[in-house]
Amino acid sequence: MNLTDLRPADGSKQSGNFRRGRGHGSGNGKTAGKGHKGQKARSGAPRVGFEGGQMPLYRRLPKRGFKNRNTKEIISVNVSMLNRFEDGADVTLESLREIGIISNPKDGVKILGNGELTKKLNVKVSAFSESAIEKIKALGGNAEVI
């Protein structure tokens, strides 16, 4: 037998949760490891955002604005993006999603006139800007609001 083989006898070691504050004989009585008095010795934690009594940041800053729950989330797509389609193709919400130009049209799509269009297309979406309609029709295409 070596010194490295020594193990505590069965049942001599306590396992499980250590019970704090159970008398001074336990070695962890009286203040139970909390020190003396003060905020950190008390039960419960201060609420989120509490800054020791000074005016908290969320009350120092002014209230401002609101989020309109009736607003429509319309995705804008420029005519230059429509050049990914074949010449003479029909452009719809589904085809825009398939080709990867939009991911999730919530309240519709509006075609804007930024960039150049080089192909004749039949576009059927929620809305158009005037310049987008001009560019689509200039190449013999069709712009239809659905």
Curated annotation (Swiss-Prot):
Q: Which Pfam families does the entry link to? A: Ribosomal_L27A
Record's GO cellular component, any one?
Answer: cytosolic large ribosomal subunit
Question: What terms describe the molecular function in GO for this protein?
Answer: rRNA binding; structural constituent of ribosome
Q: Does the keyword Phosphoprotein apply?
A: no
Alphabetic keyword roster: Ribonucleoprotein, Ribosomal protein, RNA-binding, rRNA-binding
What the entry lists under Gene3D superfamilies is as follows: 3.100.10.10
Where are the residues of the annotated region Disordered? 1-54
Q: Does the keyword rRNA-binding apply?
A: yes
* Record PANTHER family: 50S RIBOSOMAL PROTEIN L15 (PTHR12934), LARGE RIBOSOMAL SUBUNIT PROTEIN UL15M (PTHR12934:SF11)
Q: Which family does it belong to?
A: Belongs to the universal ribosomal protein uL15 family.
Q: Assembly and interactions?
A: Part of the 50S ribosomal subunit.
Protein's recorded name: Large ribosomal subunit protein uL15
The record's gene field reads rplO
